[in-house]
Amino acid sequence: MCIRDRLLARVGLAEKANAYPAQLSGGQKQRIAIVRSLCMHPDVMLFDEPTSALDPEMVGEVLSVMRDLAHEGMTMVVVTHEMGFAREVGTRVLFVDEGRIKEENTPEEFFDHPKNARLQEFLSKVI
């Protein structure tokens, strides 16, 4: 089995190996993008709001793949508003406001004891 087929099976899309983009859902397209990146055997993967344009039903599919990558030891830098995911999977969490890092901490400290007033306000609205 070639690497493409192994990776497609890993993200639950083996049957889509020959599909065109127009035949894929948003969540499937995101998982295919992850597969394409994994084919290059990266040391680090960067994600910029990977779920922001997805229907709510598709978000879980993409987060599941990313969760698996994290559990396998893949280093990931993820820009996200998915706070539950950041808390569960992150080893460091940063809050960026107006283009500046306002707070950086472990997930436990970040979510349970935020020091920055703007972060406290943000978390009170999204959690």
Task: Cite the ranges covered by each PLM segment.
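Hydrophobic anchor residue at the start of the ABC signature
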Residues: 34
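A short, surface-exposed alpha-helical micro-motif characterized by mixed small hydrophobic
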Residues: 86-88
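Catalytic Walker B motif of ABC-type/P-loop ATPase nucleotide-binding domains
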Residues: 45-48
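H-loop/switch region of ABC-family ATPase nucleotide-binding domains
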Residues: 80-81
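Helical segment within the ABC ATPase nucleotide-binding domain
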Residues: 59-72
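Conserved signature/switch motifs of ABC ATPase nucleotide-binding domains
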Residues: 19-22, 40, 72
